């Protein structure tokens, strides 16, 4: 309250707290969002309290961490704890929402959260319970409609999906995550996955991962705007050439199938995400 220089604002905060039985943080936030108009702020609060609620019970968050933490390591939630966490959220491991949570928690390792990642992540989201996180998830997913935020989410996924200490992502894992993050965004998704499984069969480098988003965003249905002299990874050059040689760009073909469904191979590869919550793997990889 001392941060408020205006006595009028301080009085409105006290009045708001008395009326709504909320805390000071919520009162200040709601009044600020409504230009310090008391009647408007109180009406909007009662219509949508979840939006304005800003009081956090940090002890409650710490208790949640204790519920899921690894018995052998008190400073992290391991794979089994994450599975328990996802079960409480009614989420499957290969759900995009799981990846969004990891993104918001700034998780560094797949299938686990450090104590700081979990507690700070919950605090940053302004939530202190599973039910509140459930309510928040659709809002977080909508953030991906912003191109800048989606790009950040997409780049985060590379670091999250690769094994610690490795420079690239195992091919099957890369395909699995591409099917999650680029579904509905890359018209050649299924054909890309088919090409990789038939012709590449190696790990995916950061450069290829990052630039595929630019390719997916800008390429037209006929790939007629592809610049083979541009600074594209060789793998994407090879993909375009392969599509042209194998008539994947014929008028009667359906390159947009990636928008509609996942290929059976891609769907199968997503099992790797679920299995990653059960075991950890170390693999020697070649990069492309």
Swiss-Prot record:
DCUN1 domain boundaries: 56-244
Keywords carried by this UniProt record: Nucleus, Ubl conjugation pathway
One Pfam annotation reads UBA_4
Q: Does the keyword Nucleus apply?
A: yes
**What does the UniProt record say this protein does?**
Promotes neddylation of cullin components of SCF-type E3 ubiquitin ligase complexes and thus regulates SCF-type complex activity. Function promotes cell proliferation.
- Assembly, per entry: Interacts with the cullin cul-5.
- For this entry, list what GO says about its biological process: cell competition in a multicellular organism; positive regulation of protein neddylation; protein neddylation
Q: Where is the composition biased (Low complexity)?
A: 254-278
Q: Region (Disordered): which ranges?
A: 249-288
Annotated knockout phenotype: Viable but with decreased survival. Adults display abnormal locomotor behavior and mutant females produce less offspring with wild-type males. Third instar larvae display a reduced response to touch. No gross morphological defects. Ubiquitous, but likely imbalanced, RNAi-mediated knockdown is lethal. RNAi-mediated knockdown in embryo eye primordial cells, produces small, rough eyes,. RNAi-mediated knockdown in the middle wing patch, results in a significant reduction in the L3-L4 distance due to a decrease in cell number, whereas cell size is unaffected.
Its name, as the record gives it, is DCN1-like protein 1
Composition-biased stretches, type Polar residues, lie in 279-288
Intracellular or extracellular location(s): Nucleus
Sample GO molecular function, one term = ubiquitin conjugating enzyme binding
List each copy of the UBA-like domain by range: 9-46
Signal sequence span is: none
- Which InterPro entries does the UniProt record give? DCN-prot (IPR014764), DCN1-like_PONY (IPR042460), PONY_dom (IPR005176), UBA-like_sf (IPR009060)
Gene name of the record: SCCRO
Q: Which organism is it from?
A: Drosophila melanogaster (Fruit fly)
Write down any Gene Ontology CC term.
nucleus
């Amino acid at each position: 309250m001392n941060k408020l220089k205006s006595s009028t604002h301080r009085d409105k905060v006290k009045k708001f707290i008395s009326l709504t039985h909320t805390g000071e943080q919520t009162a200040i936030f709601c009044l600020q969002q409504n230009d310090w108009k008391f009647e408007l702020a109180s009406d909007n609060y009662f219509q949508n309290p979840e939006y304005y609620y800003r009081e956090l019970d940090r002890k409650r968050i710490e208790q949640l961490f204790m519920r899921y933490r690894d018995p052998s390591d008190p400073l992290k939630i391991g794979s089994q704890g994450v599975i328990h966490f996802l079960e409480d959220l009614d989420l499957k491991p290969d759900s995009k929402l799981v990846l969004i949570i990891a993104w918001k928690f700034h998780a560094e390792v797949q299938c686990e959260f450090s104590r700081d990642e979990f507690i700070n992540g919950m605090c940053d989201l302004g939530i202190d319970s599973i039910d509140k996180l459930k309510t928040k998830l659709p809002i977080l997913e909508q953030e991906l409609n912003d191109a800048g935020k989606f790009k950040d989410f997409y780049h985060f996924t590379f670091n999250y999906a690769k094994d610690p200490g490795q420079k690239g992502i195992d091919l099957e894992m890369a395909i699995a995550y591409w099917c999650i993050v680029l579904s509905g965004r890359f018209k050649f998704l299924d054909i890309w996955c088919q090409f990789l499984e038939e012709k590449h069969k190696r790990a995916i480098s950061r450069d290829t991962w990052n630039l595929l988003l630019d390719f997916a965003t800008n390429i037209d249905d006929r790939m007629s705007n592809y610049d083979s002299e541009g600074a594209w990874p060789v793998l994407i050059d090879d993909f375009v050439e392969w599509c042209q040689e194998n008539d994947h760009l014929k008028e009667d073909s359906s390159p947009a199938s990636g928008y509609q469904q996942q290929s059976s191979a891609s769907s199968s590869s997503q099992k790797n995400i679920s299995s990653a919550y059960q075991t950890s793997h170390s693999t020697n990889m070649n990069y492309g």
